[in-house]
Amino acid sequence: MSQTAMSETYDFLFKFLVIGNAGTGKSCLLHQFIEKKFKDDSNHTIGVEFGSKIINVGGKYVKLQIWDTAGQERFRSVTRSYYRGAAGALLVYDITSRETYNALTNWLTDARMLASQNIVIILCGNKKDLDADREVTFLEASRFAQENELMFLETSALTGENVEEAFVQCARKILNKIESGELDPERMGSGIQYGDAALRQLRSPRRAQAPNAQECGC
């Protein structure tokens, strides 16, 4: 198997969203996660941008297909169509902007109404590097997350702090739900697909049983 083919082998594929008001650094978070560097010439997203990356979560290889949605109101009707079947989401606000924090409830309502039934959401307070200009306290956001059953991290797309951890935590919780039976990857609209590696494991018991069936003389 070629190195390229090996690098594309994964156990699961998860559809992710990055949502929140314009100017919160959503595209910069995605760029930092994919490229491991800060995107310093970022303009507001027009419609939807896309990125993907394979990560190792507890020994499972998970490919994240990530849709970065525009935060401006005029694009909401377009971006809502991408919510369908999302398994996970980063709900992003800017810790230096009270306005972006106050808009979280609307974004959360859209995600839970339009995405998959069991969508896993992590709240990300971005621009942690601008702590001196903070308008939203860690405690206040932590309470919001607890009240709405969200995970929560403060992140910095500039320094990279907690950026990968946000995606990994969200993916880990989805994996836990699959293992517990709460999520079924084969259910339409789950936002989850089996990768080649997982499909091989699912099929291997059937192959192992085949010789026994042939040996039967009845």
Curated annotation (Swiss-Prot):
It is found in: Membrane; Cytoplasm; Early endosome membrane; Recycling endosome membrane. The keyword Magnesium applies. It catalyses: GTP + H2O = GDP + phosphate + H(+). Belongs to the small GTPase superfamily. Rab family. It comes from Homo sapiens (Human). This is Ras-related protein Rab-4A. GO terms for biological process: antigen processing and presentation; neurotransmitter receptor transport postsynaptic membrane to endosome; protein transport; Rab protein signal transduction; regulation of endocytosis; vesicle-mediated transport; vesicle-mediated transport in synapse. Its main location: membrane. GTP binds at residues 23-28, 42, 44-45, 71, 126-127, 129, 157-158. Its EC number is 3.6.5.2. It is an enzyme of class 3 (hydrolase). A lipid is attached at residues 216, 218 (S-geranylgeranyl cysteine). Phosphorylated by CDK1 kinase during mitosis. Serotonylation of Gln-72 by TGM2 during activation and aggregation of platelets leads to constitutive activation of GTPase activity.
